[in-house]
Amino acid sequence: HLCLQKSKQQMTKKAADVQWFDNPCHLGEDAEAIIERAHLVGVTKMITVGTDLAESKVAIQIAENFENVWATAGIHPHEATHGTQGLKELLDSPQVVAVGEAGLDFYYDHSPRNEQKEVFKQQIELANKKSMPLVIHTREAWDETFSLLDAEGTPEHTVFHCFTGGPIELESCLSRNASVSFSGIATFSTASEVRAAIEECPLEKLLLETDSPYLAPVPLRGQINEPANIIHTGRLIAEIKSLTEQEVATATTQNAER
């Protein structure tokens, strides 16, 4: 399966002056090389996400093998048909720092919507019961997502990952005290609404992610993405908010560590 050796040595601490936190990404079998390349450009901390039971177990194993890498465990809406059985036990792992990614995807509808809603509801309940953060994936389902959060109680630390909304959706997230994570999508020419949301998002509610290997930012769009590329999105956010890269990196890292 995964040929991972315990890498407790600090990987090349040449790293850049600016230190970034990728929250989240999807690490796999080539995690060691990807993490080394990330460290070389100052991406020193990462959360790797689970999307079903098997991938959550892989995420936990990777987090166990590398310093400053943590995992989430959850059932993505695409996998909702399989239910949440076995998830609760994975959340007991010391490497797991959040429930997710969980949510609703009415764009692809890979699972029936009623099953998506039930599985999302169960994961909100788990996050609340275990006092854990919740990482949300929502696509073409903003109203339904907010309705379920309101019905079940939005967990204290809730993150809307890979945010694709605009200022209106941002306000709905912030009104529920949630944080918002921006990916390489923000660099796409078509993402003017996302950039408008970045401009309005309070720095203390802003997180950064690659969602790698997906969504490589401009100028790398279309390539396989990895955590090292977070600097492109970070620079864009610094430009939009008239901040330095260091200020964005420090704030988003502190936000991720809360």
Predicted regions and their residues:
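Mid-domain alpha/beta scaffold segments of enzyme catalytic cores
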Residues: C3-R258
